[in-house]
């Protein structure tokens, strides 16, 4: 009898859903746009203060897990629970909850990854370091390539330990988030708006 995901231990989940990196796929952008439309349909545009494609799949030309990360910001604390409950009713699974942060996923099954997999990072307005990191790497392809090399070096070492894989990237990410905030705060935001306009066209 196959266990349900919520019945599995962390080690069992890591075995079923290993770290697996692939070359950049242009269709990741399309996955994001379709899922963004689904989220707006489910939640309504008014509750969503910001929605973004984040993570390595949003950075051109680098290897990434075949999982599209989405950041969704809401304006009120009470909206976090309401949005979470609506998403759970629409095929999303809660991965973790902490202070003013909820992580959900879609595309995880008892048989392994589905064809399309998403991670949703539900946050309060302004909690978006991932945007600084994405934009900085988009503006600095050499740093993006260094990040790719770091991930490739960690892949097999931590293939079945996602927490260790994530922790090993933290110092690199935090360093360039700080760089983006301290040296290029306004330009990073302007770059994002320009890139958003390009995506719409």
Predicted region positions:
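Helical scaffold of the NTase/Pol beta-like nucleotidyltransferase catalytic core
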Residues: 1-52
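Short amphipathic alpha-helical segments
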Residues: 17-19, 66-70, 116-118, 133
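Active-site nucleotide-donor binding segment shared across nucleotidyl transfer reactions
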Residues: 39-70, 74-78
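A contiguous binding-surface segment within folded domains or other stable secondary-structure elements
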Residues: 78, 85, 95
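Short amphipathic alpha-helices in soluble, non-transmembrane regions
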Residues: 82-90
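Conserved catalytic core of two-metal-ion nucleotidyltransferases
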Residues: 92-125
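Catalytic cores of NTP-dependent nucleotidyl/adenyl transfer enzymes across multiple folds
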Residues: 124, 128-201
């Amino acid at each position: 009898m196959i266990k349900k995901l919520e019945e599995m231990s962390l080690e069992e989940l890591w075995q079923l859903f290993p770290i697996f990196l692939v070359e950049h796929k242009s269709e990741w952008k399309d996955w994001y746009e379709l899922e963004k439309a689904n989220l707006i349909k489910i939640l309504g545009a008014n509750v969503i203060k910001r929605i973004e494609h984040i993570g390595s799949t949003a950075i051109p030309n680098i290897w990434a897990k075949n999982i599209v990360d989405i950041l969704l910001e809401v304006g009120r604390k009470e909206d976090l629970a309401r949005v979470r409950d609506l998403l759970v009713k629409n095929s999303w699974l809660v991965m973790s909850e902490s202070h003013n942060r909820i992580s959900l996923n879609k595309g995880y099954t008892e048989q392994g990854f589905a064809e399309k997999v998403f991670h949703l990072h539900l946050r309060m307005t302004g909690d978006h370091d991932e945007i600084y990191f994405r934009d900085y790497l988009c503006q600095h392809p050499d740093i993006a390539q260094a990040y790719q090399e770091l991930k490739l070096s960690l892949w097999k070492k931590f293939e079945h330990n996602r927490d260790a894989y994530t922790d090993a990237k933290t110092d690199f990410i935090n360093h360039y988030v700080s760089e983006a905030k301290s040296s290029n705060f306004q330009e990073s935001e302007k770059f994002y708006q320009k890139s958003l306009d390009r995506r719409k066209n």
